[in-house]
């Protein structure tokens, strides 16, 4: 367990603007990781290994992309007990994202709305940070699995999006345990159009070709996952599942944030533009996971994410068909203690 209960820090952090609180937390984490001060949030890692997509995960709870967009805090995040950590989304060039304010808390619903828009420092800075991480340089029996999440720049026309994804894939490939192709953020104009039949087929076809070339060049085949939205009907999920299999993708991350506001109507900030995350997304995400599992069959890796606020929520994703889960908004509301709570619940209830 953490030596400093998150309950002591949360009132201070929740007294700040959400993005200011996030920046302060990440800056503190970056400065203290690997030092004695990190004992304030360190935790022993639950041992519950699983082999997935050719990788060995130490346990079944990971960090979702979006918290550490620039890969500055890999070591500090690893110390919280995660079995895997996904950082990004990174784009070829740095970009500021959408105008502020762009992040809003809905505490009555244990939820957040964000319209950040892939704000990040760009691929070169991202890769420099990845390479400086201590956990990536340590030779341990159960190393941290690191996922690198890639996207497109806002100024890149959607018809040229594949060029941005290939640029990022070229850069991250030597450094990633797996790569996630993010085509589901609602905060980059037209990005979700890449989930449609023909667009997804074309994109994944190019990515698959480039991966084969990179595998020959680097002497290793890095698994590629695709992150999709919760706002899909059954027919759309079936098309995506078939396209993933056709292009030999290694897994799917389900799901990103939702545009729906049905679960938060009437709450302050509920009508802000952006993606809704947290508790209200749990069932929508689980529905997509169930549909994916039915369409993909047993054995196709699914990372379940969306609305995990407790150990029981994590178990619900495994029962829906996910192999492992990720958390992000739950970490903000519940603190690092949620990592082990979720990992232990999955271990006990599988």
Swiss-Prot record:
Binds 1 FMN per subunit. Its EC number is 1.3.5.2. GO terms for biological process: 'de novo' pyrimidine nucleobase biosynthetic process; 'de novo' UMP biosynthetic process. It comes from the Bacteria. It is an enzyme of class 1 (oxidoreductase). It is found in: Cell membrane. SUPFAM superfamilies: FMN-linked oxidoreductases. Its cofactor is FMN. GO terms for molecular function: dihydroorotate dehydrogenase (quinone) activity. Substrate binds at residues 69, 114-118, 182, 187, 256-257. The active site is at 185 (nucleophile). GO terms for cellular component: cytoplasm; plasma membrane. CDD domains: DHOD_2_like. It catalyses: (S)-dihydroorotate + a quinone = orotate + a quinol. Pathway: Pyrimidine metabolism; UMP biosynthesis via de novo pathway; orotate from (S)-dihydroorotate (quinone route): step 1/1. Its main location: membrane. It is a peripheral membrane protein. FMN binds at residues 65-69, 89, 149, 182, 227, 255, 278, 307, 328-329. Keywords: Cell membrane, Flavoprotein, FMN, Membrane, Oxidoreductase, Pyrimidine biosynthesis. Catalyzes the conversion of dihydroorotate to orotate with quinone as electron acceptor. Monomer. Belongs to the dihydroorotate dehydrogenase family. Type 2 subfamily. HAMAP family: DHO_dh_type2. This is Dihydroorotate dehydrogenase (quinone). It comes from Polaromonas sp. (strain JS666 / ATCC BAA-500). The gene is pyrD.
